[in-house]
Amino acid sequence: MTEIIEVHAREILDSRGNPTVEAEVTLLSGISGRASVPSGASTGEHEMLELRDGDPKRYLGKGVTQAVNNVIEKIAPEIVGMDCLNQRDIDYTMIALDGTENKGALGANAILSVSIACAKAAAAVVELPLYRYLGGVQAKDIPVPMMNIINGGQHADNNVDIQEFMIMPVGAPTFREGLRMSAEVFHNLKAVLKGKGYNTAVGDEGGFAPNLASNEEALAVIMAAITRAGYEPGKDIAIALDAAASSFYEKGKYILAAEKKPEKTADEMIRFYEDLANRYPIISLEDGLAEDDWEGWKALTQAMGSRIQIVGDDLFVTNKKRLEQGISKGIANSILIKLNQIGSLTETLETIQTAKEAGYTNVVSHRSGETEDSFMADVAVAANCGQIKSGSLSRSERLAKYNQLLRIEEELGDRAVYRGRSALYSVR
């Protein structure tokens, strides 16, 4: 009854109106699993290949019919007949079939869609919640959300360099309360921005995207919103940043257009972050330097890694080998987990385990081009990752993940654990 009898795929649209892959896996029992994959705007150089058609006459070259056909014509014949409960075998069969280092033959988007669809079908056939099927009885940590309430960089059409200014409800007793607190801050931020005459249109991830006087002004208005909502900055609500520094790294320099002194070295960037962390309750910094600036990253970790969380996204791209390289060099103390960066569920879970064994935190993350699929929320709980990024408090493709976590927390009842500030091991 757990045998795969059919694999299908189709082209659907993501939250930016661009095509992406959706796959369906049907079992002998008649049960099926369906999954769609996201797409990033600020993509790491070392990510697995997202296969696009490149035909300018269709979707401006962003069609995914080739990836869809690879699922139907190449992947399906290989995995039909396999047992959906053997996730690792299925994933490594697809990886071997692709045969490239970057999944460039079949496309990471093709492989991942099938990988997740298989997991969903398997959970359904054994009648277990997805997080329980993937994580077993120990799956109980409800992650602390990082909510991107001011969008900049490549996620917005504004003059703010830093890509994400996020809030984390570290003082909440439960996820449900943390979500409420964050929503109240979000709505108060809208009022603060309106009061200053700023635009309150939102960016790709549902956060506000105003033109501000500087990157620091984003922090100032967030602080005002936290206080206006009746919370204490740092104690109830902390701040996290995703600089996405590779996007403003040019010829060995970091160019912050919104700053009075725009051109900075790695050392000057570190001092810039240290100054902000000294004056604002920043507890996490993601991609503070460029993805291949290993020496800069080491200096950043040495300077700030004992007091805040230093997260590698473009640096590690959910890749176990790159993570192991970083661990050996003492670089960062946390990794961002994006399933489509590596392209299979099995490899994602292996990377999460490698990080845990090294004492690194895991932050499960969405992409800027998302779908309504909430699978990543179940993965975060299944692997007890403790933290999740799914955008702001608007746009339903973002809230789908948060709402799924509400359901999981309710289902777990007294067994649910919300760790708050302690989910960030390195924060003092």
Swiss-Prot record:
Pathway: Carbohydrate degradation; glycolysis; pyruvate from D-glyceraldehyde 3-phosphate: step 4/5. SUPFAM superfamilies: Enolase C-terminal domain-like, Enolase N-terminal domain-like. Catalyzes the reversible conversion of 2-phosphoglycerate (2-PG) into phosphoenolpyruvate (PEP). It is essential for the degradation of carbohydrates via glycolysis. The gene is eno. It catalyses: (2R)-2-phosphoglycerate = phosphoenolpyruvate + H2O. Mg(2+) binds at D242, E286, D313. It comes from Syntrophus aciditrophicus (strain SB). Keywords: Cytoplasm, Glycolysis, Lyase, Magnesium, Metal-binding, Secreted. It is found in: Cytoplasm; Secreted; Cell surface. Belongs to the enolase family. The active site is at E205 (proton donor), K338 (proton acceptor). GO terms for biological process: glycolytic process. PANTHER family: ENOLASE. Its EC number is 4.2.1.11. (2R)-2-phosphoglycerate binds at Q163, K338, R367, S368, K389. GO terms for molecular function: magnesium ion binding; phosphopyruvate hydratase activity. Binds a second Mg(2+) ion via substrate during catalysis. Its cofactor is Mg(2+). GO terms for cellular component: cell surface; extracellular region; phosphopyruvate hydratase complex. This is Enolase.
